[in-house]
Design a protein with these regions (language model features):
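Generic recognition of flexible, low-complexity loop/linker segments
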Residues: 54-57, 64-66, 126-128, 159-161, ...
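Bacterial Sec-dependent N-terminal signal peptides
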Residues: 1-21
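Active-site pocket-lining segments that scaffold enzyme catalytic pockets across diverse folds
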Residues: 149-152, 156, 171-176
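Catalytic and substrate-binding clefts that recognize carbohydrates or anionic sugar/phosphate headgroups
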Residues: 19-136, 151-163, 459, 514-528
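Carbohydrate-binding surfaces of carbohydrate-active enzymes
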Residues: 160, 164-165, 187, 197-207, ...
């Protein structure tokens, strides 16, 4: 009997091994690669001495992932499932338990590779998120209120926006407005009249979004009732609802492969819209790490890890005002994406441009570079309002101003002196002035599928710009070269041609220039 069991185990093991597919990319001289995960942005491009690795089934580095790699020499790789990748030296090694690899040459450039893979696997949808995301700043109550979301302070924050001369736009009320996780009703002690609050915010010129997640507190009545209906992930090998550990504790998780569970959750959100006039939702979580096939069972028997991430994003797309952080296989969908929480630090600032480029090259072009100054609330703890690095906040704001979207959270009027506040106000207005152009680029992306924020090598191949990660093109028109350190000077690589900068000076391209950048200035260059 033992021998039979051993034989069966060995046979099963052989099946598992045979099901795993592998691919090895030998990086050519001068070739660079992008892809796999937005969170690896600062490690891109691969092949220039940088190392990177990820296991897409297990984790996502707090952001979007996609089963693609694309190269500066026109090569593109697609996998029909999540893969494990290690990029080091002149090789990229990949394995997948759930998919097969397709490595193909689409042309000679990064743009050729992206467009080839994109048209084949996530073509343009023709749809774009609401224009307000692109034409006005977005605001989020997270850093100011953290877990103390309440009606009085939400209104105070909104009033601060208006009183300090910032444009109104989308306003997101973040985590802990609700009675409990999965109990999507305002906490009465914190929000005595939520309908009146939403009406007032609308009258002030805001659209209102609420934070939501796929978790449900196990010890709530809602959790117990929904568990009986079978709406949650099951503990592996049992009929009991699974309990997962996430950043706010222990919870059940909706199994969105169950059509009834999905319909129920969608109705919960739609009901908030009907009763309170809510415009949309910030869809947090959905990360594949909460849906491991090793730990849970799912309704349809197949939608594990990234498949549930995709189902969460698809639920988000049912609401026009949405925001995602985790995503899978929804390139070119009309989903607002956000870079994962960045620290209040200069490293956090340096991560913004590479992250935005990485997101765009996966098809996630309608993206916001996190929150101005950072969205990781713990890095704001213990700092007196007059002790913030004002230059860091301003430089972060400047980067946001020439991105598809910009998002404030920490209130600049609370932590900045008059001079630095004036600068932030000016760049919020500048973003609005660029609104028509940014919106036109968003609409063009909806038709062509090409990213709004582009790597220099994407727009200017063959000019040795593959390694440039601190400047970018916003559409075809603007080369943006923000300051991402505490210095007031930087080098700018100008592609061939003529360029007019933000001061009106015309430069001859095809060279590197060094420019002075006082705190008031965001360097940008218009192609002539």
């Amino acid at each position: 009997m033992k021998r039979e069991i051993l034989t069966l185990a060995l046979a099963f093991g052989a099946l598992v091994v045979s099901a795993q597919t592998t691919e090895k990319i030998n990086i050519e001289d001068g070739e660079r690669w992008w892809g796999a995960a937005t969170g690896l942005g600062l490690s891109m491009p691969y092949g220039g001495g940088k190392k990177a690795e990820i296991d897409q089934r297990k984790y996502n580095l707090n952001n979007q992932t996609s089963p693609l790699l694309i190269s500066s020499k026109g090569r593109g790789l697609w996998c029909s499932g999540p893969f494990k990748m290690k990029a080091e030296g002149k090789q990229i090694n990949l394995t997948s338990d759930k998919g097969s690899f397709e490595l193909q040459t689409y042309g000679k450039t990064l743009r050729d590779a992206y467009c080839g893979v994109m048209q084949k696997h996530f073509p343009p949808t023709g749809s774009v998120p609401p224009e307000l995301f692109f034409t006005r700043p977005t605001y989020n109550t997270w850093i100011e209120l953290v877990y103390n979301q309440n009606q009085a302070d939400v209104m105070k924050y909104a009033k601060g926006i208006v009183d300090n001369g910032f444009p109104t736009g989308v306003l997101m009320i973040d985590d802990n407005w609700q009675q409990d996780y999965g109990v999507w009703e305002f906490r009465a002690e914190q929000f005595p009249n939520p309908k009146a609050m939403v009406d007032s915010l609308h009258d002030m010129g805001f659209k209102v979004m609420l934070w939501v997640c796929p978790f449900v507190s196990p010890d709530s009545k809602k959790g117990r009732d929904l568990a009986k209906k079978g709406y949650f992930l099951k503990r592996k090998g049992t009929d009991e609802p699974a309990v997962v550990v996430w950043w706010n504790g222990y919870s059940h998780v909706y199994d969105l492969s169950n059509p009834e569970a999905r319909a129920y959750l969608k109705h919960e959100f739609a009901d908030l819209q009907q009763r309170y006039g809510i415009d949309g939702f910030k869809f947090d979580a959905g990360d594949q790490c909460y849906y491991s096939e090793d730990e849970v069972d799912v309704y349809d028997g197949k939608s594990y890890d990234v498949a549930q991430t995709q189902l969460w994003a698809q639920l988000g797309s049912e609401f026009s005002y949405n925001e995602m952080r985790a995503c899978w296989l929804e390139g070119n969908a009309p989903l607002v994406q956000r870079l994962g929480d960045k620290d209040y630090s200069w490293l956090g600032v340096r991560q913004l441009v590479p992250g935005m480029i990485a997101a765009g090259l996966q098809g996630y072009g309608y993206t916001c570079p996190d929150m101005i100054g950072g969205g990781s609330f713990t890095t704001f703890y213990g700092i007196d309002p007059d002790k913030f690095d004002q230059k860091l906040i301003v430089r972060s704001c400047q980067i946001h101003s020439m991105m598809p979207m910009m998002q404030f959270s920490v209130a600049p009027w609370r932590i900045l002196d008059k001079h630095h506040l004036d600068i932030c106000r000016r760049y919020a207005a500048w973003h609005s002035q660029l609104g028509d152009y940014i919106l036109s680029e968003a609409r063009r992306m909806a038709k062509t599928g090409e990213p709004m924020v582009r790597a220099m090598d994407y727009s200017f191949p063959g000019q040795g710009l593959e390694g440039i990660v601190d400047q970018y093109m916003l559409g075809d028109k603007y080369l943006v070269a923000p300051v991402v350190t505490s210095a007031d000077q930087r080098d700018v690589r100008l592609p061939k041609g003529k360029w007019r900068d933000d001061t009106g000076k015309v430069w001859r391209g095809g060279r590197t220039i060094t420019i002075n950048v006082p705190i008031e200035r965001l360097p940008w260059f218009e192609r002539l």
